[in-house]
Regions:
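Glycine-rich phosphate-binding loops of nucleotide-dependent enzymes
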Residues: 2-262
Length: 262
């Protein structure tokens, strides 16, 4: 019987190594390291002021790190702007979604990169065709791509924002409180969308305070407290009580998590 050497683990889509951010004498994030894998949903959790927004702003190119390194496919990268991060395949869907109310679904998907014919004529037919295709790929049921966004529900708007990231080939999608202010049915649709992103091999970083949502779709939970990463948990091996204890700073819960990690 021939023995084959074990294959090396796949290179993570995104890796943060010792990332820190200082604002004057205030340390917003301190020595945070993490890895995000393709086809995996990672929940980023923490109380207000834990450092979640700072971490997202650095990964999405809004704020440069004070120290540490961001690696994409194992290679160090530096983002001078959000456009740099988007070109590298990192998309962030913020709570405001950045959609234009009076533009159609298709126009919002192609916002800023509209295809043209003859060098100057907007190719609306192509926009509508490709918009319908990407929505079908995501198994999203929406009105026709010519429909203005103002007529869409909250969950449908979230779907348009996510579809835009897929259309532009994003390999990592950061979702900031995607179900905030949504009803039960709309929340279920957004969670289905996250599952579909995972199925298609996209890495998803989910920022949420909703533990039900986290336990429904996440594979891992990264927990920040006072700017530091204090836990990296397998969702299948943890509980709501443990996560809440870590978020609020329970010493006994933190000790248990550290013992298990060791």
């Amino acid at each position: 019987m021939r023995c084959h050497p074990a294959l090396p683990p796949p290179v993570p889509v995104l890796e943060l190594a010792g990332l820190s951010r200082h604002f004057g004498h205030v340390t917003a994030l301190a020595d945070v390291s993490l890895q995000l894998a393709a086809g995996q949903v990672t929940a980023l959790l923490g109380d207000n002021g834990a450092g979640k927004s700072t971490l997202i702003s650095m990964v999405s190119g809004v704020t440069p790190p004070s120290a540490g390194e961001i690696r994409l496919d194992g290679r160090p990268v530096r983002f001078a702007s959000p456009a740099d991060a988007r070109r590298a395949g990192i998309a962030t869907v913020f709570q405001n979604l950045s959609l234009v109310e009076d533009r159609s679904i298709a126009e919002n998907l192609f916002l800023g990169c509209e295809p043209v014919r003859f060098g100057f004529v907007l190719d609306r037919r192509r926009m509508n065709r490709e918009a319908e295709a990407v929505l079908e790929r995501l198994k999203v049921n929406l009105p026709p791509a010519t429909t203005a966004v103002r007529y869409l529900s909250g969950g449908q708007r979230q779907a348009v924002a996510v579809a835009r990231t897929v259309l532009h080939g994003s390999r990592l999608v950061i979702m900031d409180e995607p179900t905030a202010a949504l009803g039960v049915r709309e929340t279920a649709r957004v969670l289905d969308l996250i599952r579909e992103l995972r199925r298609q091999g996209t890495a998803v970083l989910l920022v949420s305070h909703n533990m039900d949502n986290v336990f429904e779709v996440a594979d891992r939970a990264l927990i920040l407290r006072l700017g530091r990463k204090i836990a990296d948990l397998d969702i299948a091996r943890t509980s709501r009580a443990e996560i809440v204890g870590l978020v609020v700073g329970s010493a006994s819960t933190r000790a248990t998590a550290q013992e298990r990690a060791a």
